[in-house]
């Protein structure tokens, strides 16, 4: 499986806060210079690179003299606004020493939830990569709200991997990879070298939360690998403290945990749907509709829906669940929640009579539906 790493043409590299800051005392410029040297070496070997960089909040905290991460959103956003300036300048100057150009891109979930903005972001990123520019991406913490935040840069990195159709996502962390148990408490814990991203056994060993400076624990990294797998990308979760880790991965060394995609590539629109994490409501299906979606790959018709939950507008994302509450699919609805309430359980040819008009015969078309 390691040939998937050595042969990967396009990498998304995510570096966490703990690897970019000096124990919370601001940005570690020396450490950043080491990362840049490794990435430049990869680029010289023909690898196309996109960097997802944490560290803005941590850098801002240092400049403000804060020793612990604040919980109030406005304080976090203030720290991010201050720290982002330092972060992007540090990356720019360090890459410039090697004659490499960088570009800053700040994203929110809204940017990727809207189809038009998603396509614009994808076009911009691909253009930058084509111009031999290294994009440096972070979440736009200054304007984001709880409702539209990615939650962590692991998730953001996975969505970026989808955007640019990366072959490999490398998540650099303060652990050497995923273990069979917590190595801090269990001396018998063993490193998991390779696994399928969708292996349910991984959930049991991925517990825990992020550190004081960051938001993402091992569970978020596992979720990120599964999201990246939707577009066919492999993911390596590996320790950033390992000397020359990127070069050694490129050389085929068996470092960290390599998680392989569980299925083939999704079509471009389905990739976007897979990364569309914000849902606005729920449709409860009957057994026949579950079969139609899961086995027959058909569209969801009103007749197969038993209940509508939540408030949503036409074109928004909803969750489709089985009678037992198990999530079956997600998709973009053709009718609002109020409209759906009036037509569920009814045949499609009754929609016009019930609403006075008919937009689509399906509640969710199969092209706008992804199984989970």
From Swiss-Prot:
It is an enzyme of class 2 (transferase). Catalyzes the transfer of a phosphate group to glutamate to form L-glutamate 5-phosphate. It comes from Ectopseudomonas mendocina (strain ymp). One of its GO terms (molecular function) is RNA binding. Pathway: Amino-acid biosynthesis; L-proline biosynthesis; L-glutamate 5-semialdehyde from L-glutamate: step 1/2. This is Glutamate 5-kinase. Its main location: cytoplasm. The keyword Chloroplast does not apply. Its EC number is 2.7.2.11.
């Amino acid at each position: 499986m390691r040939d998937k790493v050595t042969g990967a043409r396009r990498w998304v590299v995510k570096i966490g806060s703990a690897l970019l800051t000096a124990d919370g005392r601001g940005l570690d410029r020396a450490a950043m210079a080491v990362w840049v040297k490794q990435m430049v070496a990869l680029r010289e070997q023909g690898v196309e690179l996109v960097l997802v960089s944490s560290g803005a909040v941590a850098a801002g905290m240092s400049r403000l003299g804060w020793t612990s991460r604040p919980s109030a959103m406005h304080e976090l956003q203030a720290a991010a606004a201050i720290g982002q300036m330092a972060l992007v300048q540090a990356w720019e100057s360090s890459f410039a020493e090697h004659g490499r150009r960088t570009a800053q891109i700040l994203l929110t979930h809204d940017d990727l939830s809207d189809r038009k903005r998603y396509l614009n972001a994808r076009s911009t990123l691909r253009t930058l990569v084509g111009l031999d520019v290294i994009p440096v991406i972070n979440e736009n913490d200054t304007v984001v709200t709880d409702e539209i935040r990615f939650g962590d840069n692991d998730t953001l990195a996975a969505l970026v991997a989808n955007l640019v159709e990366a072959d490999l996502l490398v998540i650099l962390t303060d652990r050497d990879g995923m273990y069979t148990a917590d190595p801090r408490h269990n001396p018998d814990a063993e490193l998991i070298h390779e696994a399928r991203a969708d292996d349910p056994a991984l959930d049991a060993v991925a517990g825990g939360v992020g550190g004081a400076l960051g938001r993402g624990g091992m569970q978020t990294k596992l979720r990120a690998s599964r999201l990246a797998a939707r577009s066919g990308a492999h993911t390596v979760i590996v320790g950033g403290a390992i000397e020359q880790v990127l070069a050694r991965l490129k050389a085929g060394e068996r470092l960290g945990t390599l998680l392989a995609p569980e299925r083939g590539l999704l079509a471009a629109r389905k990739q976007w749907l897979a990364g569309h994490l914000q849902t606005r409501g729920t449709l409860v299906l009957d057994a026949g509709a579950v079969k139609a979606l899961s086995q027959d790959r058909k569209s969801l018709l009103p007749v197969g829906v038993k209940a509508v939950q939540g408030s949503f507008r036409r074109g928004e994302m909803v969750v489709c669940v089985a009678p037992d509450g198990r999530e079956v699919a997600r998709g973009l609805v053709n009718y609002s929640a109020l409209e759906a309430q009036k037509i569920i359980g009814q045949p499609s040819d009754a929609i016009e009579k019930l609403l006075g008009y008919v937009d689509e015969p399906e509640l969710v078309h199969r092209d706008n539906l992804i199984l989970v």
